[in-house]
A protein has these predicted regions:
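C-terminal amphipathic helix plus adjacent low-complexity
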Residues: 380-381, 385-432
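Membrane-proximal basic amphipathic "stem/tether" segments
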Residues: 1-48
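Nucleotide-sugar donor-binding patch of glycosyltransferase catalytic domains
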Residues: 300, 345-393
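A nucleotide-sugar donor-handling region in carbohydrate enzymes
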Residues: 19-37, 161, 174-257
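A donor-sugar binding/catalytic signature common to diverse glycosyltransferases
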Residues: 158-159, 318-362
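Nucleotide-activated donor-binding/catalytic signature segment of Leloir-type glycosyltransferases, i.e.
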Residues: 294-318
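Active-site and donor-binding regions of nucleotide-sugar-utilizing enzymes
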Residues: 53-221
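Conserved catalytic-core segment of nucleotide-activated headgroup transferases in glycan assembly
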Residues: 63-73, 215-302, 410-417
Length: 432
């Protein structure tokens, strides 16, 4: 018995030594990056103007628009969009997707560069672009290493999360403690709970984190009137409801999705209430591809489902910008991650779908504060009741989260102003 106990103690001790060695190795790596970044800052300070590349995977998750616009109007910055390919799809499809995304930003009048050079049929070497600072919006290995790890290792890099940081999974490693996070020159966090998590779980302990608030949401607070209506014209006035399902149909470590259970229910309800409600189907960009490979769905069934929302007179499919959609809507039904916080900015009724109350275990403190202000939906009965309340105007709205956890970040300066100020303070020789 004593021998077994000794062996167990040795194993635990040995494992802890391995963990310690691994952590020390990473700390040395991160400290080296800090030293290199300090040298980069010194070089950049000699410049009157800096070139800033915003690395983007898809326009649907473009969340740095206010910051980009501010840089366009500031003589110190020369910003441009750099469209990266997405991994795990054929090159031909990746190139077509890049073209679509380039077109999106060109229509906005933004300077944009494709990562694929059609003239040479080669991927662009970012060293040829003269970049001083890179903005990332996704911490995961979703693109070529040249536009991910090699880029943030070699260039001064900052990170604005593409989501509002409401989730909790994998002991926070994926969201807060990858090499990516620890090697950023600066991380612009959307809320104070984010800073607490970085301090506890990241090897850098939040030393490179600045809490600014979430710049992506500025348009929702600046003006609550839509620039133009994104909704299909109807014969009579109807309530406008958004149905926004998440993509995690195959992700047990983050079981947000209720789509498999409720997709047909909500489709049937949209038919039942078509004289009273017009619907916007706003799926997560990754949902369709996952449904294509789902054993109970597949491409044909998925396309038919999407086409229903796209082509029905009382429905529409929304796959891009959603600011005007949020502003002009009357309510939302969803099981999303970031939308859990984002839709609460517009002070409208929201039904959050989940399969059980255990969902709280997959949200951080910030996410749970947002969740507490939502109407909860666990069944078809709950969905029916919410829809009835939306139609008759009795659906409840709770603004506690907005007032306590959001508006504080917009009190004196906007998140964009804080980000611009931080960069200029650190990189300009004599900032104004």
């Amino acid at each position: 018995m004593g021998l077994l106990s000794a062996l167990k103690d040795f194993k635990v001790h040995n494992m802890s030594l391995k963990t310690l060695f691994k952590t020390l190795k990473k700390q040395i790596k991160y400290q080296k990056k800090i030293i290199q970044d300090n040298q980069r800052v010194k070089r950049i300070k000699r410049k009157d103007k800096i070139k800033v590349g915003f690395f983007v995977l898809h326009h649907s998750v473009w969340k740095s628009d206010p910051v980009f616009k501010a840089m366009l109007e500031d003589d110190y910055f020369e910003p441009f969009i750099f469209i990266c390919p997405v991994n795990n799809i054929e090159d031909n499809q990746a190139i077509e997707d890049i073209k679509t995304n380039v077109s999106f930003f060109e229509k906005k009048g933004y300077p944009v560069v494709s990562s694929y050079d059609e003239n040479s049929s080669n991927w662009v070497d970012i060293d040829s672009l003269g970049i001083d600072l890179i903005f990332f919006s996704n911490p995961h290995k979703l693109t070529k290493k040249e536009y991910y790890a090699k880029a943030y290792s070699k260039y001064l890099s900052v990170y604005i999360p593409y989501a509002h940081q409401v989730s909790k999974y994998n002991n926070y490693k994926s969201q807060y403690n990858q090499d990516f996070h620890n090697m950023m020159w600066a991380i612009y966090a959307p809320h104070f709970d984010d800073m607490d998590i970085f301090k506890e779980y990241a090897i850098q302990k939040g030393k490179n984190v600045i809490v600014t608030g979430y710049p992506s949401m500025e348009p929702l607070l600046e003006d609550n009137q839509p620039n133009e209506s994104p909704w299909k014209q109807q014969e009579n006035t109807k309530r406008k409801v958004i149905f926004a399902p998440h993509h995690t149909i195959d992700t047990p470590e983050l079981p947000y999705s209720t789509f498999i259970k409720f997709s047909d229910v909500i489709k049937e309800l949209s038919e039942k209430h078509k004289d009273d409600i017009q619907w916007a189907f706003k799926p997560h960009p990754l949902l369709k591809e996952k449904l294509y490979h789902h054993t109970d769905w597949g491409k044909e069934k998925t396309d038919e489902y999407y086409d229903y929302w796209k082509n029905s007179q009382h429905c529409q499919l929304e796959e891009g910008d959603y600011y005007d959609l949020f502003k002009s809507s009357d309510a939302m039904i969803h099981d999303s991650g970031s939308f859990l916080a984002e839709y609460l900015y517009v002070k409208k009724p929201v039904l959050y779908l989940s399969l059980s109350e255990d969902i709280r275990n997959y949200q951080n403190a910030f996410g749970n504060k947002a969740y507490d202000c939502c109407t909860k939906g666990h069944s078809e009965k709950d969905i029916n009741q919410f829809i009835s309340e939306v139609i008759d105007g009795t659906a409840k709205v709770d603004n506690t989260f907005l007032e306590n956890d959001i508006l504080v970040h917009f009190a004196d300066k906007t998140p964009t102003q804080k980000i611009i100020s931080h960069i200029k303070e650190k990189l300009m020789d004599s900032p104004n």
